[in-house]
Amino acid sequence: MKLTIATRKSKLAQVQTELIINVLKDKYGISSEKLLMETLGDKILDKSLADIGGKGLFIKDIERILLEDKADAAVHSMKDVPFEVPDMFEIAAVTLRVDVRDVFVSRDGTHFKDLKNGAVIGTSSNRRAAQLKMLRDDIKVVPIRGNVQTRIRKMGEEKLDGIILAAAGLKRLNMENIITDYFSVEEMIPAVGQGALGVEIKKENKNRDLFRKLDNKNSRMCVEAERSFMRTLNGDCHSTIGAYAEIVNGQMNVLGFYEIDGRRVKKDVSGNIEDYMSLGKTLAEKILEDK
């Protein structure tokens, strides 16, 4: 048996898919090949993601391939997966999460705290831009789209003082050496699902049980708590929303960030792990009540 795993064409997407392929081979002796896709979100880089499709922009084209049985599964960054997965699909596995933090990459090595007044930082994430303003109101934020390598190139070409990226992606690309500063999860609450990979399949997939074996229970619960938070706020991966759930001593702690009507609100809740879905919802309601 040889499986076909669909993913985006970017180097990071391929590296992430190879992680899944290697587990399938090493643990279960099953070979797989990649099917590379260029999604609409990859093709159009001169517009914001919100302007060209909104929810699920990086996912829909790949789901079509699954529907046509041209691939057995797809690997996504969980932060790109909308909270509503179409009925014919399921996220069979959420992998063990890696570093969830956002990082600052400086063009000239200057640390974030030492940036000059009015420094220009690139990010197309509303979530990152809003939290940057909470840390340093003087900073000017400009949009920057593309894969990791493209953003780094644009930083130099456009003479930006720095850019904000996800630690997980840089580490998976073995590019940790370019990181200037790490933001704590309190300073910059991550995107929902950041640092975790998701394996998506058709529900009637004959290899469903195999793919489900790749699931990490704790990562799944944390990511689902965050997605419950996003669902309650009716957000997507372009909304000004961040959430981070972690399990500490048998308890789940959830941090949430939301910008509403120009106000930026951060809150947290804690509770039993078994209540992970309701914790995300409770946190969202707590934020909405903060008027």
From Swiss-Prot:
Pathway: Porphyrin-containing compound metabolism; protoporphyrin-IX biosynthesis; coproporphyrinogen-III from 5-aminolevulinate: step 2/4. Gene3D superfamilies: Periplasmic binding protein-like II (3.40.190.10), Porphobilinogen deaminase, C-terminal domain (3.30.160.40). One of its GO terms (molecular function) is hydroxymethylbilane synthase activity. Its cofactor is dipyrromethane. One of its GO terms (cellular component) is cytoplasm. The modification S-(dipyrrolylmethanemethyl)cysteine is found at C237. Binds 1 dipyrromethane group covalently. Pfam families: Porphobil_deam, Porphobil_deamC. Tetrapolymerization of the monopyrrole PBG into the hydroxymethylbilane pre-uroporphyrinogen in several discrete steps. Belongs to the HMBS family. Monomer. This is Porphobilinogen deaminase. It comes from Clostridium acetobutylicum (strain ATCC 824 / DSM 792 / JCM 1419 / IAM 19013 / LMG 5710 / NBRC 13948 / NRRL B-527 / VKM B-1787 / 2291 / W). The gene is hemC.
